[in-house]
């Protein structure tokens, strides 16, 4: 991605919501590499899909020769960002936040190159400059540059101030000052001249731009990526089970892959622009091919492959594809014990059972059937498989060989209704 027209290329992909002084930023980028940053607050023990677009944006800038700084908010994570939040956040303990900082730093690391010469990425933590700052320094050196009149008029907090049932604490109100100072600090430490973030961060970013100008007399810039929405109006990045996480222990690679496979046709080509590094030409060619093929579109599989590989690596992608294929074909011989552990985590409904159970009871306990009577009829009609093999004996008791790896048995009723038995 050539640096001189990087902003234009990001706009073509739909990745720019707002940008400050676009002309001056384009000129600055044309002059040569810059340092830029994006902040990630440890509000949980993992990043989720909402973080992926700004994180990949950092990567796009690095590929164009710029120096990315990934800032994990060890200090701001202790306070909580009120931007567009309906209620006050719960404050987490310092120990919890520190634990989450470590996890998030490890999650961010594979996306960036920390050893590539002059534009090697930097990992930073704002606790390094806030941890030992006393309240008088904070109020005198930072607070005096902020106008409360302007702060209460920022869209991000205005909604909270106007709600009778929910005000805003001084703690959360001061968040804007902390993030603003991050920008000024990174500008001084690493020459950072651009902050990127989600569109909900616009107010915090512009505060940082103003503060950097006041403290260091430097012109810096802000760019926000859009909030990702789906064509049907439902929230992106959520499933029935909640958020889609980047940590494989919270959302398995199989579940992650399936999330992308289930992308609507109305969204898939847009998402290829947001979440992959395919060129616009490649994406347009794929869309044209799908339109004219007369078959199911290929785009969802391309998207699922690309994003799963980015987040979980080749091994995670191959496991996700292997599980998908085995469930589709009914043949489980290729599945490893780790694959079954993914299914048990979140891939299919799971039930724990004591050894010695019979098939009818398993169908009831797994909620594949409402009663033993109904289970008997279903088994007799040849509609039940155990580990891919049909079983038509209603009086069947599980045998040792049904327990794959001594732990797992996969039941299927009909073509698509699965349940995994985990034996106690």
UniProtKB/Swiss-Prot annotation:
InterPro entries in UniProt: aa-tRNA-synth_I_CS, aa-tRNA-synth_Ic, Rossmann-like_a/b/a_fold, S4_RNA-bd, S4_RNA-bd_sf, SYY-like_C, Tyr-tRNA-ligase, Tyr-tRNA-ligase_bac-type
Q: What does this protein do?
A: Catalyzes the attachment of tyrosine to tRNA(Tyr) in a two-step reaction: tyrosine is first activated by ATP to form Tyr-AMP and then transferred to the acceptor end of tRNA(Tyr).
Gene Ontology cellular component? Answer: cytosol
Q: CDD domains in the record, alphabetically?
A: S4, TyrRS_core
User: What protein name does the entry list?
Assistant: Tyrosine--tRNA ligase
Where does it reside? Cytoplasm
Q: Motif location ('HIGH' region)? A: 42-51
Give the organism's phylogenetic lineage: Bacteria, Pseudomonadati, Pseudomonadota, Gammaproteobacteria, Enterobacterales
**What gene is this protein translated from?**
tyrS
């Amino acid at each position: 991605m050539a640096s001189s027209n990087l902003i234009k290329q990001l706009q073509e992909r739909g990745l720019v919501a707002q940008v400050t002084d676009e002309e001056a930023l384009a000129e600055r980028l044309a002059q040569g590499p810059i340092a830029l940053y994006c902040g990630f607050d440890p509000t949980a023990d993992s990043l989720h899909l909402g973080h992926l677009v700004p994180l990949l944006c950092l990567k796009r800038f690095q590929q164009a020769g710029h120096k990315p700084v990934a800032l994990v908010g060890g200090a701001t994570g202790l306070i909580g960002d009120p931007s567009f939040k309906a209620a006050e956040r719960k404050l987490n303990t310092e120990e919890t936040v520190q634990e989450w900082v470590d996890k998030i730093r490890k999650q961010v690391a594979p996306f960036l190159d920390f050893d590539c010469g002059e534009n090697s990425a930097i990992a930073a933590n704002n606790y390094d400059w806030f941890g030992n700052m006393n309240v008088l320094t904070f109020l005198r050196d930072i607070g005096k540059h902020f106008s409360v009149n302007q702060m209460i008029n920022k869209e991000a907090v205005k909604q909270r101030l106007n709600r009778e049932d929910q005000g805003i604490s001084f703690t959360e109100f001061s968040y804007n000052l902390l993030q603003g100072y991050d920008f000024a600090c990174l500008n001084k430490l690493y020459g950072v001249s651009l902050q990127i973030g989600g569109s909900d961060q616009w107010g915090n970013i512009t505060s940082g731009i103003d503060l950097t100008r006041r403290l260091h007399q430097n012109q810096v810039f802000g760019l926000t990526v859009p909030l990702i929405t789906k064509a049907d109006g439902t929230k992106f990045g959520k499933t029935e089970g909640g958020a889609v996480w980047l940590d494989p222990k919270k959302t398995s690679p199989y579940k992650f892959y399936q999330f992308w496979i289930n992308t609507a046709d109305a969204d898939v080509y847009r998402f290829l622009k947001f979440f992959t590094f395919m060129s616009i030409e490649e994406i347009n060619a794929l869309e044209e091919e799908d339109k004219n093929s007369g078959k199911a579109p290929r785009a969802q599989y391309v998207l699922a492959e690309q994003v799963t590989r980015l987040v979980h690596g080749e091994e995670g992608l191959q496991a996700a594809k292997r599980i998908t294929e085995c469930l589709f074909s009914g043949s489980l011989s290729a599945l490893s014990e780790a694959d079954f552990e993914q299914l048990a985590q979140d891939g299919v409904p799971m039930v724990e059972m004591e050894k010695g159970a019979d098939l009818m009871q398993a169908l009831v306990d797994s909620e594949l059937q409402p009663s033993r009577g109904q289970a008997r009829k279903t088994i007799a009609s040849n509609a039940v498989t155990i580990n891919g093999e049909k079983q038509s004996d209603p009086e069947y008791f599980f045998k040792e060989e049904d327990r794959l790896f001594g732990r797992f048995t996969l039941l299927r009723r009909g073509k698509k209704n699965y349940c995994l038995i985990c034996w106690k």
